[in-house]
UniProtKB/Swiss-Prot annotation:
UniProt-recorded name of the protein: Glutamate 5-kinase
Domain (PUA) ranges: 280-358
Residue numbers binding ATP: 14, 173-174
Swiss-Prot/TrEMBL keywords: Amino-acid biosynthesis, ATP-binding, Cytoplasm, Kinase, Nucleotide-binding, Proline biosynthesis, Transferase
PROSITE patterns reported for this sequence: GLUTAMATE_5_KINASE (PS00902), PUA (PS50890)
Gene: proB
Catalytic activity: L-glutamate + ATP = L-glutamyl 5-phosphate + ADP
UniProt organism field: Pseudomonas fluorescens (strain Pf0-1)
Length: 372
């Protein structure tokens, strides 16, 4: 199983705030230097690297003399703006000591939800990787709002893994990996060395929240692994405080939790759809539609929808749920919520009579639909 790690040619490495700061007192340049040494060694071994780095808010808090993470959005954004400057400069200077170039990329959810901007970001990242430049990526905290933020850099790292079609996503954390119980309260807790990303039993052991400086807990890391699996990537959740952890992963040492994809890589457009985290409405399906969609490669017709919830426009992402509320699929709606309410439960032949026109015979076309 660990051959999937040692043989991986394209890595996305995510390093959290707690591993980059000196107990919240600014950036730990020594620690960053150790990370850079390991990443340069990977580079020299032929591994293509993309770095997703947290730490901007924590670095900004230190510069401002704040000891507690603020809750007000404008204060967080101010801290991010101040801290991002120091963060990217620290990475650049440290990599430059080893003759490596870096490039800063700040992303928002809107960048990846818009198909054209998504493709532009993908092209830029691939060009940088081919030039042997190390992209340093962070969420653009200065401009995002709660409605459009990724929520945590674990999710961002998974979406970046999709973007660049990475073989391996490495999520470095302050825990040694995923355990079958909480090791902080249960001394008998055992590390889970390998599992499938879609294993439902993992949800029960992934409880907990993020630390004081970051936003992501183990649940977000599991969700990130499942998202990365959409593009066929394996994910390692591993303790960032383990000595020379990246070197040891490359050598095949059995550390951390390796989560493997449940199926092969999705087509490029489906990967993009899988990255849509913001949904605008819900379509409640009947049992027949649930059965049809579950078979795969089927479009959602109006006749199979019982209820429309929320407000959405044509082309926006909606969730498709079974009568019992289980999420079945997500897709881009061919009709607005108001239009959909008029045609649900009807055959496609009736659309023109009900609306006066027919944009598409399907409510959601199979090319714009992804099962979950």
């Amino acid at each position: 199983m660990r051959s999937k790690v040692t043989g991986a040619q394209r890595w996305v490495v995510k390093i959290g705030s707690a591993l980059l700061t000196a107990d919240g007192k600014g950036l730990d340049r020594t620690a960053m230097g150790v990370w850079v040494e390991q990443m340069v060694a990977l580079h020299e071994a032929g591994v293509e690297l993309v770095l997703v780095s947290s730490g901007a808010v924590a670095a900004g808090m230190s510069r401002l003399g704040w000891t507690a993470r603020p809750s007000a959005m404008h204060e967080l954004q101010a801290a991010a703006a101040i801290g991002q400057m120091g963060l990217v400069q620290a990475w650049e200077s440290s990599f430059a000591e080893h003759g490596r170039h870096t490039a800063q990329i700040l992303l928002t959810h809107d960048d990846l939800s818009d198909r054209k901007r998504y493709l532009n970001a993908r092209s830029t990242l691939r060009a940088l990787v081919e030039l042997k430049v190390i992209p340093v990526i962070n969420e653009n905290d200065t401009v995002v709002t709660d409605e459009i933020r990724f929520g945590d850099n674990d999710t961002l790292a998974a979406l970046v893994a999709n973007l660049v079609e990475a073989d391996l996503l490495v999520i470095l954390t302050d825990r040694d990996g995923m355990f079958d119980a909480d090791p902080r309260s249960n001394p008998d807790a055992q590390l889970i060395y390998e599992a499938r990303a879609d294993d439902p039993t993992l949800d029960a052991v992934a409880g907990g929240t993020g630390g004081a400086l970051g936003r992501g807990g183990m649940q977000t890391k599991l969700r990130a692994a499942r998202l990365a699996a959409r593009s066929g990537a394996h994910t390692i959740i591993v303790g960032g405080r383990l000595e020379r952890v990246l070197d040891r992963l490359k050598a095949g040492e059995r550390i951390g939790t390796l989560l493997s994809p449940e199926r092969g890589m999705l087509a490029a457009r489906k990967q993009w759809l899988a990255g849509h985290l913001q949904t605008r409405g819900t379509l409640v399906l009947d049992d027949g539609a649930v059965s049809a969609l579950s078979q795969g490669n089927k479009s959602l017709l109006p006749v199979g929808v019982k209820l429309v919830q929320g407000s959405f426009r044509r082309g926006e992402m909606v969730v498709c749920v079974a009568p019992d509320g289980r999420e079945i699929a997500r897709g881009l709606a061919n009709y607005s919520a108001l239009e959909a309410q008029k045609i649900i439960g009807q055959s496609s032949d009736a659309i023109v009579g009900l609306l006066g026109y027919m944009a598409e015979p399907e409510l959601v076309h199979r090319d714009n639909l992804i099962l979950v």
